[in-house]
Regions:
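Charge-dense, helix-prone N-terminal extensions
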Residues: 1-149
């Protein structure tokens, strides 16, 4: 199974709403960052797809994480971003995020400005070509991908 088919199978384990939202968020970032390498981590708590210039996780700029009830956009160096509207959440030393509910929020001017700023301040993406999709890790043990009943 190729990486695209594997990613689709990972997403299909979520509820129809979260799967649809996750695909929409990923498609939005793929269109904005067509040369980015996408790194997939099917972790214990969530399915995470990082976007960066290379296959090194340390150079990832953004990531989309699918949780059982929602999708979240992470800015891996979010602490460095100018966020006058207070859009970003988090208190850690580096990462900031935003819950994408409704999913159309990813297309809002505030989020797009943060995405553009994160990309502008990161290690540069390739200028040409199409980014690769790489399955980096699949956790043997995982939480349910569906909300608790």
């Amino acid at each position: 199974m190729d990486a695209g088919a594997q990613l689709d199978a990972f997403i299909d384990r979520y509820s129809p709403q979260v799967a649809s939202d996750g695909r929409r968020a990923l498609s939005f970032l793929e269109q904005r960052l067509p040369t980015a390498t996408r790194l997939v981590y099917d972790n214990y708590n969530a399915l995470v797809v990082g976007f960066g210039p290379t296959d090194k996780a340390s150079q990832a700029i953004l990531s989309i994480a699918l949780y059982p009830e929602y999708v979240r956009l992470f800015f891996l160096r979010g602490i460095e971003l100018n966020d006058p509207g207070g859009t970003l959440e988090g208190k850690g030393s580096q990462v900031r995020s935003v819950k994408l509910h409704p999913i159309s929020r990813i297309e809002g001017a505030d989020i797009v400005a943060l995405i553009d700023s994160a990309v502008a301040n990161a290690y540069p993406l390739p200028r040409t070509g199409k980014g690769k999709l790489i399955i980096k890790a699949i956790a043997a043990k995982q939480r349910s991908r569906r909300p608790a009943a």
